[in-house]
Amino acid sequence: MGLFHKKDSRSHDSRNDKAAIRPSVTIDKLSEYSIRSPKLVSDSGSNGHLPRMVTTIPNNVEIPPAPDPATKPAAYLRSIQSVRERSRLVLMRAKSNSLNHFNVDMSKFQETADYVMSIIKRDYAGDYANIPPHGRWQHFEVGGRPRVTQLLQSWPTTIDNQERTRRLIDLFLVSVLLDAGAGTSWSYKSKESGRMYSRSEGLAVASLEMFKAGYFSSDKNQPHQVDASGLKNVTVETLAKGMQVSDANPMSGLEGRAGLLIRLSSALQNPELFGTEGRPGNMIDYLMSHPTTQAASVPVVPLPTLWSVLMDGLTDIWPATRTKIGGVSLGDAWNCTTMPTSPPAEAWENIVPFHKLTQWLCYSLMVPMTKLLNVHFAGAELMTGLPEYRNGGLLVDTGLLTLKDADAKKGLETYQRVTPSNKAVEVVPMFEPGDDVVVELRAVTVGFLDELLAAVNKGLGARLTLAQMLEAGTWKSGREIAQVSRPITKGPPIGIISDGTVF
């Protein structure tokens, strides 16, 4: 990871060398790193692609408004609507270059949009409608190997689509919860192919192979499931074994991941949402029978109904140290000094919510439900861009955002403190997840992703959904520009000390 390159045995400050990473300069070199997101092989008749998710609300599907923050601040900050509304306040300050920790060069915005468009054109020119939505499925298929399709084909034909979807949701939920940043040193060698993978794809392949081996199931006769009793047996040691973690192959946040799965075991003991078995996949039965679900030619589920299952049903999995209001844990929501407040400020006014892992769950779980059961989600446009290090790193690496000097100095001191001297390469400012620098960056990332979607669609003459732009554009662009800017670690320009529960 690094804002700085190692060159001639000296640290080189890439913040002052933006020309080296501008899209127009690097696009030819970047092409060697990327592959087109794989088609998701489906049943015959669907042309190998997922059905498109509903992005407009049918007239007869009512989307409930967010709770009133004045009377129910905790409920409001846990709602999906609050993420965009609160982050937009930070975006407004960014546009006037009045952030606390970053300088904003709006002249770089169009360059950033042009770079994202160049990546999308390179991989999908003339085929924009078939860009898959951002989700965990694509990570499983790294290297062009259709692992999810092969998993589906391995099950007897007597297993109906509802149970197949339950099993995929079991897998996807655990895999997403394990998807926090693993660090730049960890990798995984697939037991099936012998190939090495790292980062999100490595975590995806590792979690899939653990799932197939029955790590998360209490039923020896049915290893391909996740249940509360099976998760009770998870320990740091078993997770380390499954993830191939060792002194020579360290993973950031291993203990945090294990703790998340152990707490998930308790959260799944909710028969109304997850059945008597305590399986994540049983949420399908809850959603299909929910009074807000409309069963017309296809099932139509309001997005807030799925959101409620994940936010309310999984509340107990988040660390006890997370921000609270009135004793209610808010999950991935943090105090931010950039938030405007009205005197006398209420406690909730300083908080900006992100709910990144919950949103990543939503994006990922909608895919198998849409693909196998043809479920449509009304109100999917309430989802936001994901405030994580690839999307945020893109804004920094293109020069749209530049960390202020005092914060850069503080972050570099943290890097030197937590990084062994013999492993200090491509040095970057580093911060804790709750640091005001990180919270401000995440908030402005959510806002700028909305702005980029409008600019990208205008430039391409397309109608991409936000989920499609995340998949084919910003997430991939953030990764590729990082690979060129920091070719050793391929990490983001601002480092996060991962606890395994945020990113």
What kind of feature is each model-predicted range?
Residues 4, 8, 14-368, 372, ...:
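Extended, well-ordered protein cores
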Residues 406-430, 434:
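Long, intrinsically disordered, low-complexity Ser/Thr/Pro-rich regulatory/activation regions
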